[in-house]
Amino acid sequence: MKYQYLLLGVLYGLLLSSCSLSAEEGDKEMDRYIANLMGKMTLHEKLGQLNLPSGGDLVTGNVNSAELTKMVRNQEIGGFFNVKGIRKIVDLQRIAIDSTRLGIPLLVGADVIHGYETIFPIPLALSCSWDTLAVERMARISAVEASADGICWTFSPMVDICRDSRWGRIAEGSGEDPYLGSLLAKAYVRGYQGNNMQGKNEILSCVKHFALYGASESGKDYNVVDMSRQRMYNEYLAPYKAAVEAGVGSVMSSFNLVDGIPATANKWLLTDLLRNEWGFCGLLVTDYNSIAEMSSHGVAPLKEASVRALQAGTDMDMVSCGFLNTLEESLKEGKVTEEQINAACRRVLEAKYKLGLFSDPYKYCDTLRVEKELYTTAHRAVAREIAAETFVLLKNEDHLLPLERKGKIALIGPMADARNNMCGMWSMTCTPSCHGTLLEGIRSAAGDKAEILYARGSNIYHDAELEKGGAGIRPLERGNELQLLDEALHTAARADVIVAALGECAEMSGESASRTELGIPDAQQDLLKALVKTGKPVVLLLFTGRPLVLNWEDANVHSILNVWFGGETGDAIADVLFGKVTPGGKLTTTFPRSVGQLPLYYNHLNTGRPDPDSHSFNRYSSNYLDMSNEPLYPFGYGL
């Protein structure tokens, strides 16, 4: 027996050695190929590889549409993003291969954040499943669908730790805990990239936003970040490092300052820490237009900002075209070196090589896959299953849930039949008309056993302009408020139980969606109070991309189920509402009692004067005059 174990050990050791040698030989082959290619490239062609414009199909910033076809022919781009549709992508790739001197293939990127056509729960919701396998499955299916439609690079995962729910992009991350965030970061990378990115279903992952973006002061997007190195290492950097350890192929720098220097041009962050300390050797890309935006920081105009970004370790310039248009002159002036340009170009080419684009430039251009692999029944079933794992039951007085499929159930609220808003933020690649509404899901599940009554009940906000800002690219039709409320109360009067579908609409969380008031929007609060006043039992289905302040709701509503934004939301909520599935979510982010408590998180360091009694004010203790220190719902909570 000992001999068998020894033999197995020797064989295993030889296998590992063989794999190591094979990987090393593969690296040498890549190095030879790229060195040979770069030996043929002009400076203009090298600078072109560093340029990443937006195609303008999908808007993620101020519209900055490049003339892509012209730029491809002129060898002025290394890739592009925000173009959806395999045939458009094939046409651009064909120009790059057939109509340029060296035929270098293009990277094609997209924000595939929580699904492509099949949409899964938003990342914050996914984290509440505490299920790394579920996250990996989501990323794997997203990669399959994106790659089938021509995409080879996703700007995901976002792993920014956030403890302040005023910040809208908390919806894109995994909550407040760095350990859980690290586990989920690795799961995302495994799901997107697979083992080696050589398969047709595997795409390049990009961890973002490096670094500390989730700690933006006052929860305001793009704002300043300032903290000690001790806090950085202990509380914020771990998920980025975990993604690097998992082999993530690219990293996106963040908009914010780190140590008073924009992350885009922060050499300590991008080179000393990321590359030298952590050993990252992949592609480093900026965020949208961030090199140009260094002028707004008061740091430098575009030309000097481009120099600083390159010197700091940036490889690819997203949208600003600073590298393309200014680095040649800066090279002549001695402000950058050819070695720095070559290093950046090499890493862009290495990413393409690792994706297999040099051996098969049309690897992601199989038009037959689109018909077979997007929004499939199997993918939707997985999304529906995972969604129920993310729902968090916050309250269930008298065991009101699950509901019986009998009698009359009133479904009331502006989120009940809002098809455009079911998928949540960062779902621009999907086709909203394909996704079912909550009303459709509940009626389907109830069948002929219960009558489902419906009324919209209210607008999102009383203020039309405020609602317009929150609705973003998914506007909701507004109605007469008195008529909406009257219809809702009439509907409620006929019902045995009321299900209120309320909360944020999809674009009220995500990028550029900071809030100072974190309650359910006012028009919906008024509706909810009127529904509770009827005396009928009320279930609140809470749609949100962030923790909200729910003191009144917790005190007055019978049951509260936080459903986030779940993709296959309608069917998944119906599964839980009628007891087919038990909600499995536990909070990964703290729900405050007041905005004044923020930032609020479970693992805060002790003070020298801890509060001995969190329920009443204690002078000379670390507490508030007017509010308990305790959150409404703590990290890890869920019934």
Indicate residue ranges for each PLM-predicted region.
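Bacterial Sec-dependent N-terminal signal peptides
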Residues: 1-26
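Glycoside hydrolase catalytic-domain context in secreted enzymes
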Residues: 19-639
